[in-house]
Amino acid sequence: MVRLVLPNPGLDARIPSLAELETIEQEEASSRPKWDNKAQYMLTCLGFCVGLGNVWRFPYLCQSHGGGAFMIPFLILLVLEGIPLLYLEFAIGQRLRRGSLGVWSSIHPALKGLGLASMLTSFMVGLYYNTIISWIMWYLFNSFQEPLPWSDCPLNENQTGYVDECARSSPVDYFWYRETLNISTSISDSGSIQWWMLLCLACAWSVLYMCTIRGIETTGKAVYITSTLPYVVLTIFLIRGLTLKGATNGIVFLFTPNVTELAQPDTWLDAGAQVFFSFSLAFGGLISFSSYNSVHNNCEKDSVIVSIINGFTSVYVAIVVYSVIGFRATQRYDDCFSTNILTLINGFDLPEGNVTQENFVDMQQRCNASDPAAYAQLVFQTCDINAFLSEAVEGTGLAFIVFTEAITKMPLSPLWSVLFFIMLFCLGLSSMFGNMEGVVVPLQDLRVIPPKWPKEVLTGLICLGTFLIGFIFTLNSGQYWLSLLDSYAGSIPLLIIAFCEMFSVVYVYGVDRFNKDIEFMIGHKPNIFWQVTWRVVSPLLMLIIFLFFFVVEVSQELTYSIWDPGYEEFPKSQKISYPNWVYVVVVIVAGVPSLTIPGYAIYKLIRNHCQKPGDHQGLVSTLSTASMNGDLKY
């Protein structure tokens, strides 16, 4: 077993001893918030972990990588990668009783960059994540009408036909790309601000501010709704979905295993990435949430419970989504068949009702035998239920195009639309609680505003600042900017941060010290499983996933999909290359948080090297005194 521990002088002076923890907890009662009860804490963590990615990415990956076969690598990596890191974040936050910045600064001053990296990543992800919530609110507002505005194409200016762009695509495509985003044909074509999206963005940030205005004191109340309502809606959708024609086609298609996919490296790497991102690890929010717990809270049990529910939710959502996708595919299959039947009836003047799906092939053969020349003139569509089911869509396309199209074909479609977007709103909002916590608490530790200022002011300034920056997402090119940030802000930086977190706890803080801390908090030491995963397995898996992502991103040209009515294959999306200046944006978005970790460590090393010996001795004495008094500023 690896027992390497790097030199870390002054650690005992920077962190409270185990004997002091209970006293510190009592002293914090009046100055630091605590959870009202265990349910608040668990619901908040679940809300942060279970987000929009569970709805629109996991089902896509399941379907793309062998259906039920994908569950095998997903569950294996859930156990070997997700749960150990979640347990580590819960335990270190509960032990050191600080936010992410304070935790890593306490472990070693040079690790302050790790907390800064988490804060920057939380900020950038929250920047675009709340824009998605604003889109959800726009669809929710438009759901309170009959018929739904994306049910039919609008008429053109002359009232003589449908708008050409809609007629060439579909009503759901047109409502999403034109009436919602009013999208341009390039990220370079910024266009103007769409006022309706700006108003929705303002509403989204206002709601978030009201829910996070006093930290866990307000979010702890909100999660009773935001973290439980999605499960109620999902269950309602499952019951409704299973009663729809063709729902079982989707579920069978989803879980039909293709075991050959298990031999593909991409399957395992995508499973590892999905486990990692679905837990919202490395944002700093989970560390902050756990720091408000009692010293003797059983963080091991919490991590296992949250992990099991998170994994169960991913599978549960996939079943719900593909029951609806199965219904949609069956509807499209029936429409396709109806078109072919009509073609045959009109071509041979057959009586209506004489041709059905069951006898269609037989009627084709009869017509072909009776008049081969006339039959050869007919053009039939290819109707394949598996082809319709295979049209895998992830991300916003699943929520705002595929699901909305399926909803329009349901009876009482406005009701189902309202329920669906309320569910998405709750999932997105509860995830944003963790992102805000990952920004607010580190900024408090940095003392960017005077300590006497109330938390409401800091939270308000953050919401206002991010709202103003978010104007870029309300431009005609806003969706392209959001996709860019989604691809790079919440991927490579999080992998680097998570790897550094585990390395720092195991080899800088010391895994033996960590084991003793946990034994003090929960009554027993972590077993051999946790030892092996923390020391070797989990860091190795994260390193492999990071290297894979890095190699793929560096070796491939950066491209993105655009919506261009002038494209010859419209309504298919067109893939084009990013302009060169986007590479600078990618470096800023992915590189700055990642480089903050070694950058601050180098800065600290140079500063300590240049410091006079007498000053260094005085600094250590000051730090020790401040730590004992609880006044240490990070």
From Swiss-Prot:
Changing D517G: In HND; abolishes amino acid transport activity. One of its GO terms (biological process) is sodium ion transmembrane transport. Robust expression in kidney and small intestine, with minimal expression in pancreas. Also expressed in stomach, liver, duodenum, ileocecum, colon and prostate. Not detected in testis, whole brain, cerebellum, fetal liver, spleen, skeletal muscle, uterus, heart or lung. Its main location: membrane. GO terms for molecular function: amino acid transmembrane transporter activity; neutral L-amino acid transmembrane transporter activity; symporter activity. NCBIfam families: Na_transp. This is Sodium-dependent neutral amino acid transporter B(0)AT1. The gene is SLC6A19.
